């Protein structure tokens, strides 16, 4: 038998929804939208780093970060 601890008593409400699944797709669509937005964000950062996306007055150089 598991021993009761004060930490377990505090964390028990967080585990009260264990095993319950929302019917249907739930928030899967919303998660997909956020994944797409995060992908676009990473793509823009990569293009700035590779100088594929040109921004006026913005130099991509490691030495400029130290100034």
Swiss-Prot record:
It comes from the Bacteria. It is a single-pass membrane protein. The chain crosses the membrane at residues 29-49. One of its GO terms (biological process) is photosynthesis. The keyword Thylakoid applies. GO terms for cellular component: photosystem II; plasma membrane-derived thylakoid membrane. GO terms for molecular function: phosphate ion binding. The keyword Transmembrane applies. Its main location: membrane. Keywords: Membrane, Photosynthesis, Photosystem II, Thylakoid, Transmembrane, Transmembrane helix. NCBIfam families: PRK02624.1 (NF002728). Belongs to the PsbH family. HAMAP family: PSII_PsbH (MF_00752). PSII is composed of 1 copy each of membrane proteins PsbA, PsbB, PsbC, PsbD, PsbE, PsbF, PsbH, PsbI, PsbJ, PsbK, PsbL, PsbM, PsbT, PsbX, PsbY, PsbZ, Psb30/Ycf12, peripheral proteins PsbO, CyanoQ (PsbQ), PsbU, PsbV and a large number of cofactors. It forms dimeric complexes. One of the components of the core complex of photosystem II (PSII), required for its stability and/or assembly. PSII is a light-driven water:plastoquinone oxidoreductase that uses light energy to abstract electrons from H(2)O, generating O(2) and a proton gradient subsequently used for ATP formation. It consists of a core antenna complex that captures photons, and an electron transfer chain that converts photonic excitation into a charge separation. This is Photosystem II reaction center protein H. It comes from Gloeothece citriformis (strain PCC 7424). The gene is psbH.
């Amino acid at each position: 038998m598991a021993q009761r601890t004060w930490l377990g008593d505090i964390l028990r409400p967080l585990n009260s929804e264990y095993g319950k699944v929302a019917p249907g797709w739930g928030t899967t669509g919303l998660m997909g939208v956020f994944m797409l937005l995060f992908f676009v964000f990473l793509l823009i950062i990569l293009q700035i780093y590779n100088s594929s996306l040109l921004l006026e007055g913005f130099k991509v150089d490691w030495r400029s970060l130290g100034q």
